[in-house]
């Protein structure tokens, strides 16, 4: 059986944080505000995987009220979700994602992001796709207030 999951996440920019996307620290004057490292791409992927498995969302699995997740790398959380996936006897066919940000440009970092995600999930890099988009100056991303990410995953059970 095949199962599809969809994920979305958004975080606002913050002056005193690093910008982490797909487990890659991207040089930029602002980072994203959040309880963990606020990696919107990984969070969207986690929610997509959890959705396809019929599990709770990222906020219930890794609540921001639990201090053990404070500033944690989202790659660590993704590895935990990978274990759940394996325990359920499911495997990833492919992941397709979109990062929406006016700035910074994402394309120079997507290859390293794919590598990080594939390694965390124990899949091939060719099973992960990442696209960067702007909103042509529209919306909160266009006003450079934050970043959003969308992910869809196809699982096989």
Swiss-Prot record:
A GO molecular-function descriptor: metal ion binding
A GO biological process held by the record: isopentenyl diphosphate biosynthetic process, methylerythritol 4-phosphate pathway
Enzyme class: lyase
Keywords attached to this entry: Isoprene biosynthesis, Lyase, Metal-binding
Record has Lyase as a keyword: yes
Cofactor(s) needed by this chain: a divalent metal cation
Classification via Pfam families: YgbB
Pathway membership: Isoprenoid biosynthesis; isopentenyl diphosphate biosynthesis via DXP pathway; isopentenyl diphosphate from 1-deoxy-D-xylulose 5-phosphate: step 4/6
EC number: 4.6.1.12
InterPro entries: MECDP_synthase, MECDP_synthase_CS, MECDP_synthase_sf
Catalytic activity: 4-CDP-2-C-methyl-D-erythritol 2-phosphate = 2-C-methyl-D-erythritol 2,4-cyclic diphosphate + CMP
Disulfide bonds: none
Bound cofactor: record note: Binds 1 divalent metal cation per subunit.
Binding residues for 4-CDP-2-C-methyl-D-erythritol 2-phosphate: 9-11, 35-36, 57-59, 62-66, 140, 143
Complexes and interactors: Homotrimer.
Family membership: Belongs to the IspF family.
Function noted in UniProt: Involved in the biosynthesis of isopentenyl diphosphate (IPP) and dimethylallyl diphosphate (DMAPP), two major building blocks of isoprenoid compounds. Catalyzes the conversion of 4-diphosphocytidyl-2-C-methyl-D-erythritol 2-phosphate (CDP-ME2P) to 2-C-methyl-D-erythritol 2,4-cyclodiphosphate (ME-CPP) with a corresponding release of cytidine 5-monophosphate (CMP).
Listed name of the protein: 2-C-methyl-D-erythritol 2,4-cyclodiphosphate synthase
Organism of provenance: Caldicellulosiruptor saccharolyticus (strain ATCC 43494 / DSM 8903 / Tp8T 6331)
Lineage per the UniProt record: Bacteria, Bacillati, Bacillota, Bacillota incertae sedis, Caldicellulosiruptorales
Gene transcribed to yield this protein: ispF
């Amino acid at each position: 059986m095949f199962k599809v999951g969809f994920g979305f996440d958004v975080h606002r920019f913050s002056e005193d944080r690093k910008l982490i996307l797909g487990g890659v620290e991207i040089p930029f004057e602002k980072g994203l505000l959040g309880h963990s490292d606020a990696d919107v791409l990984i969070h969207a992927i986690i929610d997509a995987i959890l959705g396809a498995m019929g599990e709770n969302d990222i906020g219930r699995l890794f609540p921001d009220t639990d201090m053990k997740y404070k500033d944690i790398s989202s790659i660590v959380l993704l590895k935990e979700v990978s274990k759940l996936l394996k325990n359920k006897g499911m495997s990833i066919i492919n992941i397709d994602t979109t990062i929406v940000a006016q700035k910074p440009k994402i394309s120079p970092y997507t290859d390293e992001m794919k590598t990080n995600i594939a390694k965390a999930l124990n899949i091939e890099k060719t099973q992960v796709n990442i696209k960067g988009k702007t909103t042509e100056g529209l919306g909160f991303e266009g006003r450079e207030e934050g970043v959003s990410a969308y992910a869809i995953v196809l699982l096989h059970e």
